[in-house]
Amino acid sequence: MVYEERDYRIKAGKLAQFVKIYGEYGLPLQKKHLGTFVAYFTTEIGELNHVVALWGYESLGDRETRRKAMLADPEWQTYLDRVTDLIDIQTTRILNPVSYSPLQ
């Protein structure tokens, strides 16, 4: 299994709005299309106004297929219209668990 970490720096003062919209609209759509929903976090200390999502996939090919389907969904495009102006920067990393990681 591979894990995708998506880190979004949200514009100042917009974090609560982003989290609410994501919970109501984005997450249900992602659960419909993507792999395993692992976790969703906001930052409390250090670099603030971040949300971090973790998703698990069987492989990079699985991730690519699922994300293509989601991007083609008109409802996903509507969701993006709601949140794009709230996001400052987005980064994505693929994480591979080591043999002794509790997440495999």
What residue ranges belong to the model's regions?
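Short, structured motif recognition centered on aromatic/hydrophobic residues
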Residues: V2-R6, F18, H50-L54
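A common structural junction motif
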Residues: L29, P74-E75
